[in-house]
Every structure is written in C-alpha cells, then in structure tokens.
Amino acid sequence: MGKGDKMRETRTLEFKEKLTNTFLKTVSAFANYDGGTILFGFDDNGKNVGIEEIEETCIKIENKINTMIKPQPDYSLSTHNRHQTIELTVRGDIKRLKTLKLEYLFRKFPIMLPTIIDE
C-alpha cells in the first residue's frame, strides 16, 4: 500500500495514525478473540499517512505491551520503511488477556466490549 492508497477497518484490522495507549485495548481484544492486525501510520479512513521514528516507535510498542498486558500476548512487529508504517500482528489465544486496568475486552466489529467474567 503506497501513500494515498486507502483500506478499510474490519473485525481483524485496526488503523492507528500514531502511537497512543488506546492500542493496548485493541491488542487485548484481538488476543482474546481470533487475533488481528494493527497498522500504525494509517488514519481512520485507511489512508497511509506514515509515522516518524519507526524504530523508536516499535520499541515503545513492545515496552507497552510487555509491561501493560498480562499475561503477555503472542505478537509480532514488522516495519515498512518505504511507506513509514508499522504492522503489529496479534495472534488469538484461549487465555484471557487483560490490560493492567484488569478489564477483559472482546472485539466484536466495530466495537470492543468490556466483559466481566466470574472467576
């Protein structure tokens, strides 16, 4: 996808124009369901807007996931330097992952639903 090309969000694809902590809820939701991909450097309409400092942003993404979601989800990061984008792929899992706010999230496109589970 080149700059200017557009895509659409789906149940397993989310766009983030820049790195904010809201992506952690999406990671948790994807991991608690069938998995999914977050593309950083795309606006809400799927337009490639690029992201600055790709390597530094990747380190921040890894640090946030590793410290803010327990147990740690199975994920991979890849960069697309030509288009200045980052692809975060989260695999679905049967474990119930949660952010440190201790709320479970399930993704049901187009929204994420908090769910309370009796233990």
Language model regions located:
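Conserved N-terminal catalytic/coupling substructures associated with nucleotide/phosphate chemistry
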Residues: 1-119
